[in-house]
Amino acid sequence: MSRIKVVCPHCGAVNAIPKKDSYTKANCGKCHRSLLETKPIDLDEVSFDNQVANSDIPVVVDFWASWCGPCKMMAPAFEESAASFALKARFAKLNTESVQSVAARFGIRSIPTVIIFKNNMEIDRISGAQSAAQLTQWVSRFI
């Protein structure tokens, strides 16, 4: 059976798990917490690099800022969409005010901007607030 690498959303440990169409249980080998967590994780520069470099599943990153009205409007939709992708994609949020180096690295000029990373590379991006349905449809193309 083939395996996929998944970064734990709780402790950041890299786990190799059997590749399946769906999962009922999958726990981190280090912290023993669930890898099925769908709540978007908050990233700093180190955790961003770890998630993007070590995940075989797509990493969907919302670049946002606390002063951004459309970012605040989209947050519930981003969380709702994330719930559909347990171990199919990892959803994460990166505050462009506190992690400016990563935002600059990817040329973030407007927010919210959502980027999908796979195999340590950007594969697509969208800018502007999106609904949960729009996000889910967009992310599904890369699963």
Label every model-predicted segment.
Residues S110, I115-I143:
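Non-catalytic, surface beta->alpha helical segment in thiol-disulfide oxidoreductase systems
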Residues I17-A26:
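Short linker/helix segments within small regulatory modules
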